[in-house]
């Protein structure tokens, strides 16, 4: 519900402040130190992640950064959400 609200807010703000651009980045499970703090055994956690992601792995921070750079550099992208989730959303 919160994610949908953030996306709706971004679209509304994009419409209001155009031609300035507003976008949302929605990452899936990304391999960061925070994942290690989740309390689960790391190997078990990644085994569970691969079951829910079409690409069979967690994402890497650089992949999120590349998508953000793409959105920043493309002046024609606005009011949208970029899902960086390894196909998790599609698999649901």
Model-predicted regions and their roles:
Residues 2-3, 10:
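Active-site helix of classical SDR
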């Amino acid at each position: 519900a919160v994610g949908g609200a953030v996306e709706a807010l971004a679209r509304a703000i994009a419409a209001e402040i155009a031609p300035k651009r507003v976008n949302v980045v929605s990452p899936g499970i990304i391999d960061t130190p925070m994942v290690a703090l989740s309390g689960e055994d790391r190997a078990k956690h990644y085994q569970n992640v691969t079951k829910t992601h079409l690409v069979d792995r967690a994402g890497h921070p650089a992949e999120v950064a590349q998508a953000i750079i793409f959105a920043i550099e493309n002046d024609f992208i606005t009011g949208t959400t970029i899902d960086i989730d390894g196909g998790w959303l599609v698999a649901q």
